[in-house]
């Protein structure tokens, strides 16, 4: 532990020194927790930023050091960072530090670019002001082998499916082919917990923590257990859905886009990508949204805003897709020569976030190092109810106690789509 603390301290000092050196050049300093690998960072510097009118020093840092760095500059009044780029959940703690410049006027000037209202609302970080401008995004999608399309329920729109229709589709496939062809990444290193936290729970209950043990949640688990009877039993070993889709073991799958992109790239003519289904409360989905924010005390706020303007221009957003694989947040016409797998993924995410019933559900916020414990609550609930066949009510009541204790001990407030609150988020 002492070694780790010392390492973080030395790393932070080195990083601050790098920023100080960059500041002496009077370049704009852009600090990002994303695109950190050397190749991606070089693409940012050499391809994405090359047409900006000013000189930019693009510097990356680990997410766990990000708030400490901002707080250190605030406490010492030695400001060098002009612009920050980070995930929504990484920017959220800066609200309590009162560290971000309101960007309401800039958001108004960018209103014609087509950034969706749900994404702009996320950029307010629960306040009345626009504290970050959405920059780029990734996410989770559904992918289907085109062989499955003739078995869609009558009248179903694949871009506006409901969970009931998905269940009927999977049941029909099993009936007609004799195989369970729906798959989920429920393996030990899969992202099944994100499906529950960002898709299923919001779609059926309208929240995640608050309605965890509600009657709506109980009904949801009963329905999902029924659906699971038509899910490929090997799903409990799937960590990435790309390979089972390519092999044909699965005809319909859910996963993070990065984990199915290989299938879309290898056989683009055989697959279709589409939004996640909707439930009674809406089309829950978990946006992986990266925002751009200006730190209070920034040496050149005007230039920082100019860089935000540049990075959200459609042309720059297309360059981001091509070079680093993140998708646009603005209305950007994708070029005809774009990798077809990337195009399918971008289209599916765009359709999901622009759906009339879209219900964004954030990744857990405020849990610190205990995020895995939160995930475990949902995975254990799934294992007990769906895989072991236990009754939902006693399982939900038992797991709710674990969830209550975790929220209380971390003092984590509610995050969207649960309603705003003061203090720890409470399970009803």
Q: Where are the regions a protein language model picked out?
A:
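Short, polar/charged alpha-helical segment
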Residues: 34-57, 378
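Extracytoplasmic "Venus flytrap"/periplasmic binding protein-like
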Residues: 46-115, 151-152, 251-252, 329
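Hinge/lid segment of periplasmic solute-binding proteins
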Residues: 87-141, 167, 272-274
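Short, solvent-exposed loop/beta-turn-alpha elements that line the ligand-binding surface or hinge
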Residues: 105-115, 158-159, 201-220, 265-266, ...
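Extracytoplasmic/periplasmic solute-binding protein
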Residues: 127-136, 140, 164-209, 250
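Glycine-centered hinge/linker elements that transmit conformational signals in sensory
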Residues: 167-173, 207-238
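Extracytoplasmic/periplasmic substrate-recognition and gating elements
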Residues: 226-232, 264-329, 362-363
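Long, aromatic- and glycine/proline-rich binding clefts that accommodate carbohydrate-like moieties
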Residues: 269, 323-380, 384, 412-428
């Amino acid at each position: 532990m002492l070694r780790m603390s010392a390492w973080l301290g030395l790393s932070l000092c080195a990083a601050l020194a790098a920023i100080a050196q960059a500041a002496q050049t009077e370049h704009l300093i852009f600090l990002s927790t994303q695109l950190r690998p050397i190749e991606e960072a070089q693409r940012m510097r050499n391809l994405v930023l090359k047409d900006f009118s000013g000189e930019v020093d693009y510097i990356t840092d680990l997410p766990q050091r990000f708030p400490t760095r901002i707080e250190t500059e605030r406490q010492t009044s030695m400001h060098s960072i002009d612009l920050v780029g980070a995930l929504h959940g990484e920017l959220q703690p800066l609200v309590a530090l009162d560290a971000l410049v309101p960007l309401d006027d800039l958001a108004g000037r960018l209103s014609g670019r087509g950034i969706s209202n749900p994404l702009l609302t996320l950029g307010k970080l629960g306040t009345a002001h626009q504290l970050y401008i959405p920059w780029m995004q990734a996410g989770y999608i559904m992918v289907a082998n085109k062989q499955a399309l003739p078995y869609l329920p009558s009248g179903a729109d694949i871009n506006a499916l409901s969970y009931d229709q998905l269940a009927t589709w999977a049941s029909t496939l099993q009936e007609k082919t004799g195989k369970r062809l729906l798959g989920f990444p429920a393996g030990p290193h899969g992202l099944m917990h994100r499906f529950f936290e960002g898709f299923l729970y919001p779609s059926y209950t309208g929240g995640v923590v608050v309605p965890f043990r509600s009657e709506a949640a109980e009904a949801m688990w009963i329905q999902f257990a029924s659906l699971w009877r038509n899910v490929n039993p090997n799903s409990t070993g799937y960590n990435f859905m790309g390979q089972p889709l390519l092999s044909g073991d699965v005809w319909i799958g859910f996963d993070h886009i990065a984990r199915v992109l290989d299938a879309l790239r290898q056989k683009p003519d055989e697959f279709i990508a589409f939004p996640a289904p909707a439930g009674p409360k809406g089309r829950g989905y978990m946006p992986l949204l990266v925002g751009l924010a200006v730190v209070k005390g920034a040496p050149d706020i005007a230039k920082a805003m100019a860089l935000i303007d540049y990075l959200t221009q459609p042309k720059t957003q297309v360059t981001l897709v091509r070079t680093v694989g993140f998708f646009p947040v603005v209305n950007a016409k994708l070029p005809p020569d774009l990798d077809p797998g990337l195009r399918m993924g971008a289209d599916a995410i765009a359709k999901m976030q622009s759906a009339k019933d879209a219900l964004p559900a954030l990744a857990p916020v405020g849990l610190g190092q205990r995020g895995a414990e939160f995930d475990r609550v949902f995975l254990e609930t799934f294992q007990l109810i769906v895989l072991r066949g236990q009754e939902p009510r006693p399982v939900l009541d038992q797991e709710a106690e674990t969830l209550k204790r975790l929220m209380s001990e971390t003092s984590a407030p509610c995050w969207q789509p649960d309603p705003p609150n003061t203090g720890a988020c409470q399970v009803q």
